[in-house]
A protein has these predicted regions:
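Flavin (primarily FAD) cofactor-binding/catalytic cores of flavoenzymes
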Residues: 1-61, 65-85, 89-91, 105-195
Length: 195
């Protein structure tokens, strides 16, 4: 029997299938942060972040999606990335990007990679022009970040890109380029420990 708040149900078997994405990985930095530290698994919607100063840490899908959503209501939103990433639009020619990509597998890999780089450069320009770091790897050499809105929000001043965190001090964060900014919340979208 399993007891819920309002009722009880009986089952023959109980299967717990929570996978390996359940133990948040939160990097450590020098100093202490007096604001609120959160992990992306705690993010449900953007209402909690209304009128707050928020730093999102990470460069993957969750980090970028959360930064965009938070920036719609927050007083200030920044995103801290420790390296450069390639950003793949969610849709290409009206198709989900993975579906579009699967339709190009007949093209020899070297030509396909060249065309992908050319198309992204043509559509997005240089990542450095957004204040982001240049990726040190080819497209799809690592897990790509699928997001169609981050670059738009950066260019329109809704999200400020930052380098990796160097240290915390009270409510301020010092970044590796020496810049310092104050935040109410630091939200880590830095993945999970595999357990």
């Amino acid at each position: 029997k399993i007891y819920f708040d309002e009722f009880c149900e009986e089952f023959d078997y109980l299967i717990i299938a929570n996978g390996h994405h359940w133990s948040p990985r939160i990097p450590t930095f020098e100093g202490d942060f007096n604001g609120e530290l959160m992990h992306s698994h705690q993010f449900k919607n953007n209402e909690y972040f209304k009128d707050k100063s928020v730093l999102v840490v990470g460069g993957g899908n969750s980090a970028c999606d959360i930064a965009v959503e938070v920036s719609r209501v927050a007083k200030k939103t920044s995103i801290s990335m420790r390296r450069g990433y390639h950003f793949i639009p969610k849709f290409i020619m009206g198709m989900p990007s993975d579906v579009f990509y699967s339709k190009t597998l007949w093209i020899p890999q070297k030509i396909r990679l060249f065309l992908q780089k050319l198309a992204l450069r043509f559509i997005q320009g240089k990542y450095e022009d957004y204040g982001l770091q240049k990726p040190d790897h080819d497209i799809l050499q690592t897990h790509a970040t699928i997001n169609s809105e981050l670059l738009y929000f950066i260019k329109h001043g809704k999200i400020k890109p930052q380098k990796n965190i160097r240290k915390f001090s009270n409510n301020s964060v010092e970044f590796e380029d020496g810049s310092i900014d104050n935040f109410d919340i630091v939200l880590f979208a830095t993945g999970y420990k595999i357990k």
